[in-house]
């Protein structure tokens, strides 16, 4: 595995790759969810590139940028064992410059839900992903469905900017107890982790209600709120695949999303129906 630290080094390494290239952008603290993306990339492509970069522009003031878990040596070992071809580990000053040309999230879809509670977050996400795409020039890029709104906005950016990149959505990976894997799960105490399971429990309950023929969103939302009453819920949302609000469940087109605080840790999860 080759490890590079600057865009120039990565571009030089990329030129030598003859064949399809899969790309898995991450913020590090790699877990089984990230590994599932890497495995998909290796399955689909001749080469796989992974980036580990805690992107400062997607954190709001007062968020956890400084304490976000950084495990660079462990991440290197994980990528090497997974068969990654190139690992890109840049510093912010190699990615960003002063007074940059900016990529902005669309107002209607980028400033609702996650974008409402974290205004400007998706500006930072799209800015860095756009840069990474231009450096890596991947054939395909892999993103988890857990960050569903991010996935949608990246797909839209690729479409709107006529990028010749296939975005591959990948299923949410969960622990045996149902908790969606997240690098932020390390913040949870044992008691908080048990509470966090209420999020996936509420989504499973919603899915069962839909399977039983209940399509009324208010009824499903009320049931979910009852399950989540011990958490500080920011939103429970029902949207279609293009992140338009729904008035009624549409089978095969619905995403139910939850964002909630468990103690001081903010978690998100969703289910695609």
UniProtKB/Swiss-Prot annotation:
InterPro entries: Cyt_trans-like (IPR004821), Pantoate_ligase (IPR003721), Pantoate_ligase_C (IPR042176), Rossmann-like_a/b/a_fold (IPR014729). CDD domains: PanC. NCBIfam families: cyt_tran_rel, panC. Transmembrane segments: none annotated. Pathway: Cofactor biosynthesis; (R)-pantothenate biosynthesis; (R)-pantothenate from (R)-pantoate and beta-alanine: step 1/1. It is found in: Cytoplasm. One of its GO terms (molecular function) is ATP binding. Gene3D superfamilies: HUPs (3.40.50.620), Pantoate-beta-alanine ligase, C-terminal domain (3.30.1300.10). Catalyzes the condensation of pantoate with beta-alanine in an ATP-dependent reaction via a pantoyl-adenylate intermediate. The active site is at residue 34. Beta-alanine binds at residue 58. ATP binds at residues 27-34, 144-147, 173, 181-184. GO terms for cellular component: cytosol. Its EC number is 6.3.2.1. It holds the Pfam family Pantoate_ligase. It is an enzyme of class 6 (ligase). Homodimer. This is Pantothenate synthetase. Belongs to the pantothenate synthetase family. The reaction proceeds by a bi uni uni bi ping pong mechanism. HAMAP family: PanC. (R)-pantoate binds at residues 58, 150. It catalyses: (R)-pantoate + beta-alanine + ATP = (R)-pantothenate + AMP + diphosphate + H(+). GO terms for biological process: pantothenate biosynthetic process. The keyword Ligase applies.
């Amino acid at each position: 595995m080759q490890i590079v630290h600057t865009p120039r080094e990565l571009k030089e390494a990329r030129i030598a790759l003859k064949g399809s290239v899969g790309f898995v952008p991450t913020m590090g603290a790699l877990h089984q969810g990230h590994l599932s993306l890497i495995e998909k990339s290796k399955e689909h492509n001749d080469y796989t590139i992974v980036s580990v970069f805690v992107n400062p522009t997607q954190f709001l003031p007062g968020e956890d940028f400084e304490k976000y878990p950084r495990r660079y040596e462990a991440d290197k070992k994980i990528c090497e064992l997974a068969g990654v071809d190139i690992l890109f580990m840049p510093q912010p000053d190699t990615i960003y410059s002063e007074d940059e040309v900016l990529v902005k999230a669309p107002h209607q879809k980028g400033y609702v839900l996650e974008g409402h509670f974290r205004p400007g977050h998706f500006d930072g996400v799209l800015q860095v992903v756009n840069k990474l795409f231009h450096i890596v020039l991947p054939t395909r890029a892999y993103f988890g469905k857990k960050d569903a709104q991010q996935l949608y906005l990246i797909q839209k950016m690729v479409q709107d900017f006529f990028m010749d990149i296939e975005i591959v959505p990948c299923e949410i990976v969960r622990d045996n107890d149902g908790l969606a894997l997240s690098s932020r799960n390390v913040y949870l105490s044992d008691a908080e982790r048990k509470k966090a399971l209420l999020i996936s429990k509420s989504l499973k309950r919603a899915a069962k209600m839909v399977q039983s023929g209940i399509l009324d969103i208010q009824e499903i939302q009320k049931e979910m709120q009852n399950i989540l009453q011990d958490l500080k819920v920011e939103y429970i949302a029902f949207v279609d695949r293009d992140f338009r609000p729904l008035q009624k469940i549409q089978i095969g087109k619905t995403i139910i999303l939850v964002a909630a605080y468990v103690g001081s840790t903010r978690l998100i999860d969703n289910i695609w129906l």
